[in-house]
Design a protein with these regions (language model features):
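Feature captures hydrophobic
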Residues: 1-177, 182-183, 189
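Substrate-binding/catalytic lobe of Class I Rossmann-like enzymes that use SAM or dcSAM, i.e.
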Residues: 304-419, 426-429
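Conserved SAM-binding loop of SAM-dependent methyltransferases across substrates and taxa
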Residues: 209-220
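Conserved SAM-binding loop
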Residues: 237-238
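Conserved class I S-adenosyl-L-methionine
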Residues: 197-206
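Conserved beta-strand signature within the Rossmann-like core of class I S-adenosyl-L-methionine
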Residues: 296-304
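A short acidic, Gly/Pro-enriched loop at the edge of an enzyme's catalytic core
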Residues: 258-268
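A short glycine-rich, Lys/Arg-flanked "PGG" loop and its adjoining helix->strand segment in the class I
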Residues: 283-295
């Protein structure tokens, strides 16, 4: 009689010391667990070997990406429930070592090893990037990291992002608004915060597929230079600019922001790009942007932030994100971002948290992906599509639960006269 699921349920509960909140369906067809809960589908024994070899986030991610694990039921509910039984990120080795001192845990591990069977360990899925020992953030490593994430295929991104082709947090007038409306409102918000006027020069750092460059040129009469490290993004953005008849107003370059030399600019936007800069390079990033602005020019820095830790020296990047999504990416608390911008010479004038907006945005992206799943897997492969579904759904929950946030920081290169040019009443953005 098939019994893998009840055996697995019992061993996991013995290990974690609590009831398993998910239902399990095992490779032999057996099921166990709460009948109304989402079902964790364990397709083969290899899934157990992945989790035993990397007991935590990375092992779970490898099993998911390879298709060894799946969820039958609401993905968001399942991820919330799983979060309570996965080893704490950044604490895997120490937490497991402490847990193994318990005879019950050791007995459960032995039982799981017998159930998993040989061999150990399975090779990581091919979608996993090679992780450097440390985050170098040289021009070459940044270029490779950007290519891993953004050169997946423009057709795939069209499915996920929709017609707006904006890959950053939208700005929602209401939860039931369309994604396209919310993204247009975000682009307009950025332009108003920068107080763009006809003829002014805007540098868009990390310009993506050109949406902000087009909006700023078409709606505000700005002359825009957009820079990206992604060849695919640049080709797509250039075609969009040409189709809009804006080639005299918007230029798209494949260029590192550190190599831009044609300042000064009246304004700089950096939307969802600074997460790739790295903590060690952040002051250099801020200093370079300060150098490129004219006195009185404004910077709008839109960036995801993590929560600060009591001991920052022990902070470790998310293993799944670093291996499968944003190799070499780093988040830092908003306080560190503001400090580094001011160290570079900026005067920070406004910080707006739009955390809930990103949760709404991510849920729409997941819905877009799921609605065209068959074509998405044809375009990029099932493993890569599974990476994206997991990463976006988990990120939506992280924003909803206040584990991470996103902020727009408006800063000014204030002239020696001290006249910032900002309105007396904040957030009128005139």
């Amino acid at each position: 009689m098939p019994d893998a699921a009840p055996r697995l349920k019992g061993l996991v509960e013995q290990m974690v010391g609590a009831p398993l909140p998910l239902r399990i369906r095992a490779w032999d067809g057996s099921e166990a667990g709460p009948p109304t809960a989402p079902t964790l589908v364990v397709r083969n024994r290899r899934a157990l070997r992945r989790l035993l070899w990397k007991p935590g986030e990375l092992g779970l991610a490898r099993a998911w990406v390879a298709g060894d694990l799946d969820i039958d039921g609401d993905l968001y509910t399942a991820l919330d429930l799983l979060a309570g039984i996965v080893w704490e990120r950044g604490e895997d080795a120490r937490t497991l070592a402490q847990a193994l001192r318990d005879p019950e845990v050791r007995s459960a591990v032995r039982g799981l090893l017998r159930l998993a069977g040989p061999p150990l360990p399975p090779a990581p899925p091919r979608e996993e990037a090679r992780r450097p020992r440390r985050h170098l953030h040289t021009r070459s490593t940044d270029r490779r990291a950007i290519s891993h994430h953004y050169d997946v295929g423009n057709d795939f991104y069209e499915i996920v992002l929709g017609p707006s082709m904006v890959y950053s947090c939208a700005y929602w007038p209401a939860p039931d608004s369309t994604l396209e409306t919310a993204q247009r409102d975000k682009l307009e918000l950025v332009c108003r915060k920068l107080a763009l006027k006809p003829g002014q020069r805007l540098l868009d750092v990390g310009c993506g597929w050109g949406s902000l460059a087009i909006h700023a040129a078409r709606e505000h009469g700005a002359t825009v230079v957009g820079v990206t490290l992604s060849q695919e993004q640049a080709a797509y953005a250039r075609k969009r600019v040409a189709d809009e008849g804006l080639t005299d107003k918007a230029e798209i370059r494949v260029q590192d922001y550190r190599d831009v030399r044609d300042g000064p600019y009246d304004a700089i936007s950096s939307i969802g790009m600074a997460e790739h800069v790295g903590a060690e390079r952040y002051l250099e990033y801020a200093t370079d942007l300060h150098r490129l602005l004219r006195p009185g020019g404004r910077l709008l820095n839109h960036q995801i932030a993590r929560r600060p830790q009591r001991d920052e020296s022990r902070y470790e990047v998310d293993a799944f994100i670093d291996s499968y999504v944003f190799p070499d990416g780093e988040l830092q608390p908003i306080g560190m971002t503001v400090t580094q911008l001011e160290r570079a010479g900026f005067e920070v004038r406004d910080v707006e948290s739009i955390r809930e907006h990103y949760a709404l945005t991510l849920r729409r992206w997941v819905a877009n992906l799921e609605a065209d799943w068959g074509r998405a897997t044809q375009l990029t492969g099932p493993g890569r599509a599974r990476v994206w579904r997991l990463y976006m759904a988990a990120s939506a929950l992280a924003f909803e639960h206040n584990r991470i946030g996103v902020n727009q920081v408006l800063a000014v290169k204030t002239p020696e006269s001290g006249m910032s040019g900002m309105p007396l009443r904040a957030r009128t953005w005139n």
